[in-house]
């Protein structure tokens, strides 16, 4: 009888070592296949029906928040039935993350009257949640209503130590061409946070058409030189609420098939343009040629 001598290559040895693991995987389908199912579901977006169902889940705040976010970022997220849900959550929701998502949604799809519903939430006397206060201030950048000016000013000039909220409030005030707003923004230039200074200066520039930087003294001198205060805002520029923008990363230039699109700055609901003006993000029309 001739004996056979088997020679094992490194590749064969590694295969034999993996065999017990593969066998265990086949004998434990409840673990392995469930894991693959979870991975697959993570790449499959939820349907509008599922998003709406999650947004109304009475037991799971995480699902409610996720559902609200998905609905509010969809094209149909401004339907009346969803607006009523956002408003209800702004008023009555107990989970701060769900309420913050609802405030953001209402800022995106709401009306000028909704600014009245949102404005109390920028105050530290109403909520301790910094996130809620910040998203409320951001939402008010998108909704124009002069009735909220007083509360915006109060937050900007208060002794509160929340710089992010104050900076967002300073941006929102850039919509309102009022003397009291000008004075409040001057105080914003003295804030110890640079972000508040920069946003206050930008709002002053939008309101007046002037460029005096971060110097409160220079802005005050310009103000004092204006004999007719009724013409203080004669050079006002159109206000556009800011949106998230970023440059492409290096691999996005290579992967040209990846299409990234971002929301473009626009004017708040309820704010009529000062005059016919083609903004930076508008397409040219026949009248412009």
What are these regions (language model features)?
Residues 27-30:
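C-terminal motif of bacterial Sec signal peptides marking the signal peptidase cleavage site
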Residues 32-35:
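Bacterial signal peptide processing site
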Residues 37-55, 76-91, 111-124, 145-158, ...:
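Amphipathic alpha-helical scaffolding segments comprising HEAT/armadillo-like alpha-solenoid repeats
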Residues 59-60, 94-95, 125-129, 160-162, ...:
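Short inter-helical turns and helix N-cap capping residues of alpha-solenoid HEAT/ARM repeat scaffolds
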Residues 64, 98-99, 129-133, 166, ...:
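Residue-level detector of extended alpha-helical repeat arrays and alpha-solenoid scaffolds
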Residues 67, 102, 136, 169, ...:
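Conserved hydrophobic register position within alpha-solenoid helical repeats
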Residues 212-258:
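Pro/Ala/Gly-rich low-complexity, hydrophilic intrinsically disordered segments
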